[in-house]
């Protein structure tokens, strides 16, 4: 059974003692009243750590206040690279294929170049020019393929690095810069705030 929140329970901060103020996320005491959004009353009280953890669970959805809809003042920060968490799903299969292909083809080209003594055959005057062109093409082919696969592997590594860096991004919340604008809320904004709070539905125990 759901009941609509009674507006009489939404009080001003001036009417609440420091001992009664509690974070709306963890419900524990909070003696500091931050200025992260345009909310008023007890909906404004929240720990910085709790709010940041709540925002980082889904930045796209939680980047603004759910009640007053004012965007949070967020600042991006990356974790230390030694503390990064890597995810296998971000790694494309083509990266592993290209790395393996590069090593195999490059190794075959090196073995072919050394074992058959192609350099001596190319320098020999007994070999015709057509044969020399064929030998040069045959010796350079594996290295060209290896170079192309290496370029592709580098591109995949860059893509994987960017995806991993985004997953290890932390959004820190700071207090709003336009403090005076927040404090001077007109009557229309007050009505919208009341309507927003009235729409909150709290599940009551059966």
Swiss-Prot record:
Q: Which GO terms describe its cellular component?
A: host cell endosome; host cell Golgi apparatus; host cell membrane; membrane
The keyword Secreted is assigned to this record: no
In what way does this protein cross or attach to the membrane? Multi-pass membrane protein
Q: Where are the transmembrane segments?
A: 94-114, 130-150
Which InterPro entries does the record cross-reference, listed alphabetically? Znf_RING-CH, Znf_RING/FYVE/PHD
Matches recorded under PROSITE patterns = ZF_RING_CH
Task: Outline which residue ranges sit on the Cytoplasmic face.
Answer: 1-93, 151-206
Question: Might you give the EC number(s) for this enzyme?
Answer: 2.3.2.27
What keyword terms does UniProt attach to this protein? Answer: Host endosome, Host Golgi apparatus, Host membrane, Host-virus interaction, Inhibition of host adaptive immune response by virus, Inhibition of host MHC class I molecule presentation by virus, Membrane, Metal-binding, Modulation of host ubiquitin pathway by viral E3 ligase, Modulation of host ubiquitin pathway by virus, Transferase, Transmembrane, Transmembrane helix, Ubl conjugation pathway, Viral immunoevasion, Zinc, Zinc-finger
Q: What is its main location?
A: host cell
Query: Record's family?
Result: Belongs to the poxviridae LAP protein family.
PANTHER family named among the record's database cross-references: E3 UBIQUITIN-PROTEIN LIGASE MARCH 2/3 FAMILY MEMBER, FI20425P1
Which comment does the entry carry about domains? The RING-CH-type zinc finger domain is required for E3 ligase activity.
In Swiss-Prot or TrEMBL terms, this protein is called E3 ubiquitin-protein ligase LAP
Species this chain originates from: Myxoma virus (strain Lausanne)
């Amino acid at each position: 059974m759901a009941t609509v929140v009674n507006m009489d329970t939404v009080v001003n901060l001036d009417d609440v003692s420091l001992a009664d103020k509690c974070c709306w996320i963890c419900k524990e005491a909070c003696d500091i009243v931050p200025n992260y959004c345009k909310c008023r009353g007890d909906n404004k009280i929240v720990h910085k750590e709790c709010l940041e953890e709540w925002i980082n669970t889904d930045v796209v959805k939680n980047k603004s206040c759910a009640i007053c809809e004012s965007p949070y003042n967020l600042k991006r920060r990356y974790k230390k690279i030694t503390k990064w968490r890597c995810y296998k799903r971000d790694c494309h299969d083509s990266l592993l294929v290209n790395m393996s292909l590069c090593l195999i083809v490059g190794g075959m080209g090196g073995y072919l170049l050394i074992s058959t003594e192609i350099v001596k055959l190319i320098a020999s005057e007994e070999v015709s020019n057509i044969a020399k062109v064929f030998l040069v093409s045959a010796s350079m082919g594996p290295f060209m393929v290896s170079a192309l696969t290496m370029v592709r592997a580098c591109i995949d590594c860059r893509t994987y690095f960017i995806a991993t860096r985004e997953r290890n991004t932390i959004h820190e919340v700071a207090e709003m810069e336009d403090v005076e604008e927040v404090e001077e809320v007109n009557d229309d904004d007050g009505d919208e705030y009341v309507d927003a709070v009235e729409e909150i539905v709290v599940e009551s125990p059966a």
